[in-house]
Amino acid sequence: MGDNKSNGDSGKLLYCSFCGKSQHEVRKLIAGPSVYVCDECVELCNDIIREEIKEISPKQDQDKLPTPRELRAHLDDYVIGQDKAKKVLSVAVYNHYKRLKNAGPKDGVELGKSNILLIGPTGSGKTLLAETLARFLNVPFTMADATTLTEAGYVGEDVENIIQKLLQKCDYDVEKAQRGIVYIDEIDKISRKSDNPSITRDVSGEGVQQALLKLIEGTVAAVPPQGGRKHPQQEFLQVDTSKILFVCGGAFSGLEKVIEQRSHTGTGIGFGAEVKGEDDKASISDILMQVEPEDLVKYGLIPEFIGRLPVLATLAELDDAALIQILSEPKNAITKQFAALFDMEGVELEFREDALKAIALKAQTRKTGARGLRSIVEGILLDIMYDLPSTENVAKVVIDESVVKGESTPILIYENSESQAAGAE
């Protein structure tokens, strides 16, 4: 290899065998047996190969569509519990990508979209389920918050911005974006304020539902290209949203009361009323499992919007046992992540069983579900993570129940096998 000349050719002017440029016109000239190639031609070849790989990859992805069992098995590695929701999601996602693989009407039958509605409390795993599937399928994934969306022409975020975000995730590759997954969170927050159609404009509730209808069902959205505002003369990108899988999720607080009103067999008041004791009351999770589309209409979603989300999955509230599992069992469990961080310092991190129970209890008290676990663990480990890089000869850090409760500091075990509480000196 040489910059401007090759070994054995010191007095001879060399040229690129591909483009014909001399060694003085290029930065690098790579020598082979009686052949030379310049850095510009190498870069050009790389670009051509990249473009060809980009064209081939969607087809390869389609050929390797995992079965519902394989999708479910992958979800089990990262998400604890929620067995029914996993099964529903796996089948819906499989059917969606099978529809894309076999595009066009099948024997005159046009297959509809299998968009999904996830109902479950905060921190039950709605976002994680969608994100994990997208990562496994190697498709672009983006999230949107329904509470920030408004109808076009009003202050706020237009629904078309969701597609713009998806394009950004795949470097504005339209073909890739059209195979992506969009998760819209807090969908329950855009329910209309009453059952009856209002004469006033509801730009953040029913208005957003109307705006999302076409996008979710399938339309060709015109999205400005990268840096579109700086280059207004560029043509808009046309994205077919009928190929994009939309997953909507929400806590739907109070929905259980709507379901109970529908399913109640008692008269409710008077001498003939059916009175139920505390022991007869079903849990909120059990009640939500009985949800029907009519309940969602009563809650405030318009019938047309519910019709665009035919797949319904309910997630149960996580109990203490599930939270303890989430802390330690998944492949990317929080305790494993922090153990890896400590390992980078050459220190072993151990969470005792009573510590995991205490962390789960804290999360239940805060009513944050699995979402709050990380912030709790961060708080517990903050001081030791601050001091550890400056402390020598620490071999192991142990976290027990008293550390979680703030009654003591983490136990440090040194390389000479002596142990003491952090900061005890």
UniProtKB/Swiss-Prot annotation:
Family matches, as Pfam families: AAA_2, ClpB_D2-small, zf-C4_ClpX
Superkingdom of source: Bacteria
Gene Ontology MF term list: ATP binding; ATP hydrolysis activity; ATP-dependent protein folding chaperone; protein dimerization activity; unfolded protein binding; zinc ion binding
GO biological process, any: proteolysis involved in protein catabolic process
Gene Ontology, cellular component aspect: HslUV protease complex
Gene3D superfamilies: 1.10.8.60, ClpX chaperone, C4-type zinc finger domain, P-loop containing nucleotide triphosphate hydrolases
Entry-linked InterPro entries: AAA+_ATPase, ATP-dep_Clp_protease_ClpX, ATPase_AAA_core, Clp_ATPase_C, Clp_protease_ATP-bd_su_ClpX, ClpX_bact, P-loop_NTPase, Znf_CppX_C4
Entries under CDD domains matching the protein: RecA-like_ClpX (cd19497)
Residues engaged in binding ATP: P121, T122, G123, S124, G125, K126, T127, L128
UniProt-annotated binding residues for Zn(2+): C16, C19, C38, C41
Residue ranges constituting the ClpX-type ZB domain according to the UniProt record: 4-57
Disulfide bonds: none
Keywords attached to this entry: ATP-binding, Chaperone, Metal-binding, Nucleotide-binding, Zinc
Family classification: Belongs to the ClpX chaperone family.
Entry-linked NCBIfam families: clpX, PRK05342.1
Function per UniProt: ATP-dependent specificity component of the Clp protease. It directs the protease to specific substrates. Can perform chaperone functions in the absence of ClpP.
Quaternary structure and partners: Component of the ClpX-ClpP complex. Forms a hexameric ring that, in the presence of ATP, binds to fourteen ClpP subunits assembled into a disk-like structure with a central cavity, resembling the structure of eukaryotic proteasomes.
Name the record gives this protein: ATP-dependent Clp protease ATP-binding subunit ClpX
Gene that this polypeptide is encoded by: clpX
